[in-house]
Amino acid sequence: RLPAVIAAGTTEGAALLDEPDTVPDEPSYLNGMYFDEIYHARTAYEFLHTMSVYEWTHPPLGKILIMLGVVLFGMKPFGWRVVPALFGAAMLPVFFTLAKRLFRRRDLAFLAAALLALDTMHFTQTRIATVDVFILFFILLMVLFMTDYIQMDYMKEPLKKLFLPLGACGVSFGLGVASKWTGLYAGAGLAVMFFAHMIRTGIACRKDTAARREFWRRTWATVGFCCVFFLAIPALIYYLSYIPFFRYEATKPNGVGSIALVLQQQESMYHYPPDLTATHTCQSAWYEWPFTSRSVWFYFRSLGENRVSSISSTGSPALWWVSAVGAILLAVEALFRRTKKESAHWKQAGYILLIAIAANYLPWTLVPRCTFQYHFFTTFPFVVLAAILFLQHMEESGEVSGRVKWIWLSVAAAYFILMYPAASGLPMPRLYAQFLEYVLPCGQLFFGAV
């Protein structure tokens, strides 16, 4: 509290105390920043007011999107969180559409979207003003559009029609990389999907001279199109995302040119993670993530002796554990068993998902710095889709009942309800927090604080 003597006899001092009703009685996540909001939401404000930028370790687009909420609603929690929340909500119909393309069944697409909505990490990550929600949204769009492209008849559809999903995929790739560099991991997966599809199509045409000639005509046109939409346009999007940096640099007497500035930023970003040697209580290794052993503790406040408020970002064991096992079984089925029971479409969907999982997950095995469970956030949606695809195979072959998927959904919903206080910051009895920490198999949520 400010001593009253500060305000005595001075107009400036009195101005410090003339709006006491605007000061919150107790600081909390409802009236202030928590976790990485102190970097990303702050930087959004700095972008808006052409100030020196505090957070530069990720590309700017995600923070520009956060800034839009601040422009509309002010520099307050709702302002900096509304756009990430909207992207989190918009993610669900995108995910539903992708699942429907892969499974060709509306009930399984609904199951996929419902499970994603009930994942506690999806819930926490889409309620906070950080850039992770944006990169996942754009990755889902990338895979959706590439799936649309792969499922079209390359030799029969007009090139203009083929180019629509391919161009949308390239733009989504550019938006993703301009939000976070992990979009490059997903981009590598897109390249594998694309070239595998082209090679398979070329092999199918090799014995027909006319078909082979048409294949190469289409392929050269497609390669030229991809150079524009997967190289030139993403590079332009990335460059334009640095406009807030350019605006601030223009206010300096000896500002750096725009291209030189972008190159300097990339060098600094590239050297930042390898040079980072810090450790963290919540850090976890990549092989621990699917099994939710160690949450990322966003927020905690003790509300007297008997109540606490906490936000822990962790996956739901009812989803992550089951999905991890299902994805492994799918990989075994798709890569090693090679039976004739599965349709060509089912196998194609399996390969798309396995490539997406590998592209988004395996690069983390090479990262030397400390990592966290939320780095699995961009991989998990494809893991749950893989598990559902394996369940579809089991169900349609008569090996399991169609009721299994609804039982799984019910268990996931029950787990979400149990975990809701720990994922949302809702005040809860300390005894209940101890139940979550020590009885329910959720991993470490509060790290002994309860």
What residues fall within each predicted segment?
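Extracytoplasmic catalytic/substrate-binding loops of multi-pass membrane glycan-assembly enzymes
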Residues: 2-41, 53-65, 75-78, 256-257
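Loop-to-helix entry region of an early transmembrane alpha helix in multi-pass inner-membrane enzymes
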Residues: 56-66, 73-93, 110-113, 125, ...
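Transmembrane-helix motifs of polytopic, lipid-linked glycan transferases
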Residues: 82-103, 141-145
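Short acidic/glycine- and proline-prone juxtamembrane loop motifs at membrane-interface regions
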Residues: 84, 121-134, 179-182
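Transmembrane-helix signature of polytopic, membrane-embedded enzymes
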Residues: 95-118, 136-137, 154-164
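Membrane-interface transmembrane helices that cradle and orient dolichyl/undecaprenyl
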Residues: 100, 142-165, 195-205
